[in-house]
């Protein structure tokens, strides 16, 4: 078995929605990114790639490559899953922590879990998504951006 950890952060920018875990959430800002800015799926992809010793998303989907401009992070995650499967691994479980002062995540958590489970080709009870704030401390507390920590357990297929 292998364990991987992923971390990503994106700052807020102009826009009226963010995408987290594949779910579009109305918000007063968007997230600045080369792709769709789905910080949750980026951290999760890094955790999966790290567990399989396959590098990180920057190696596989560089932000200098125009083909990934505005890319759907669910498509990128599904590609990561194909890479780990090709190396003889399958997902045991994943645990994700969204760190955000706003918007409120609770109404969207179950939708995120369902989409992630589908993309990982696992059962819903193998995917956890939770959210916390920083009690108004730091860049997250000042509502300048969102961070996510992800942990993935891989098992031999």
Swiss-Prot record:
Cited Pfam families: YgbB
Residues that bind 4-CDP-2-C-methyl-D-erythritol 2-phosphate: 8-10, 34-35, 56-58, 61-65, 100-106, 132-135, 139, 142
Site entry (Transition state stabilizer), positions: 34, 133
Ligand binding (a divalent metal cation): 8, 10, 42
Catalytic reaction equation(s): 4-CDP-2-C-methyl-D-erythritol 2-phosphate = 2-C-methyl-D-erythritol 2,4-cyclic diphosphate + CMP
InterPro entries, A to Z: MECDP_synthase, MECDP_synthase_CS, MECDP_synthase_sf
Metal-binding among keywords: yes
Pathway involvement of the protein, from the record: Isoprenoid biosynthesis; isopentenyl diphosphate biosynthesis via DXP pathway; isopentenyl diphosphate from 1-deoxy-D-xylulose 5-phosphate: step 4/6
Role, per record: Involved in the biosynthesis of isopentenyl diphosphate (IPP) and dimethylallyl diphosphate (DMAPP), two major building blocks of isoprenoid compounds. Catalyzes the conversion of 4-diphosphocytidyl-2-C-methyl-D-erythritol 2-phosphate (CDP-ME2P) to 2-C-methyl-D-erythritol 2,4-cyclodiphosphate (ME-CPP) with a corresponding release of cytidine 5-monophosphate (CMP).
Assembly information from the UniProt record: Homotrimer.
Family classification: Belongs to the IspF family.
NCBIfam families with a match to the protein in the record: ispF
Protein name: 2-C-methyl-D-erythritol 2,4-cyclodiphosphate synthase
């Amino acid at each position: 078995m292998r364990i991987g950890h992923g971390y990503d952060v994106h700052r807020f920018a102009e826009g009226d929605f963010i995408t987290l875990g594949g779910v579009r959430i109305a918000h007063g800002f968007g997230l600045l990114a080369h792709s769709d800015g789905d910080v949750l799926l980026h951290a999760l992809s890094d955790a999966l790639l790290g567990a399989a010793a396959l590098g990180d998303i920057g190696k596989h989907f560089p932000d200098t490559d125009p083909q990934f401009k505005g890319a759907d992070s669910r498509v990128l995650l599904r590609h990561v899953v194909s890479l780990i499967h090709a190396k003889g691994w399958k997902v045991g479980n994943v645990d994700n922590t969204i760190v955000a002062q706003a918007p409120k995540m609770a109404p969207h958590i179950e939708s995120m879990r369902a989409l992630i489970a589908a993309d990982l080709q696992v059962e819903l009870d193998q995917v956890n998504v939770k959210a916390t704030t920083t009690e108004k401390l730091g860049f997250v507390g000042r509502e300048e951006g969102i961070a996510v920590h992800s942990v993935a357990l891989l098992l031999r297929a």
